[in-house]
Amino acid sequence: IFTTITDPDVVERARRAGIKIHWIHPLFDYNEGKKSFNYITSKMVRVKKREMGLPAIQTGGNVGTTAWFISWLILKCKTVSLIGINHAWEESDGWEKIITHNNDLPIKMEKTDPVFNKLFEKGHNPGFNCDFVLDPMFRLYSMCLKEFIVRSPDWVNTINATEGGSIFGDRITCKNFKQFLADEESNP
């Protein structure tokens, strides 16, 4: 299952590997009629083969949160381990990378600009005792995922095994991936 916002390089690698892709569109906001972002994007993903658009689910608008939803809601996994989904930047990442999401976008903002500190706030993950930088997009993604986790059924257990980032808090257990695997192996 691939979302319409999957990185094109990942899609190309999957196709070269012979993976059959099933597309979905990850919805971001609640449907509020024609002014809704969901309505607008549903119009954008319509193609000749699919006049009604691609299948869509309410997922927080990003690939990681979509995978979390599919894991417990569709696949009925009781424990969902997040790997590589940190919704933040490492403090060691260059600010040019952070400000452009690693794209070649010409954005002119100095790190000393007061706006920079408001838009790119620093945080601390107590579960892994590490610092991170949140940009506006990752802040929103992290906030949505945390809210979805808190609202999920009590039987859903979310583990952050990414070993960093902004995903921690209520109903999220932070543990390194090796420990997660060892715990799962000892509790079949």
Language-model regions, residue ranges each:
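Metal-ion/cofactor- or nucleotide/acyl-coenzyme-handling active-site neighborhoods
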Residues: 1-188
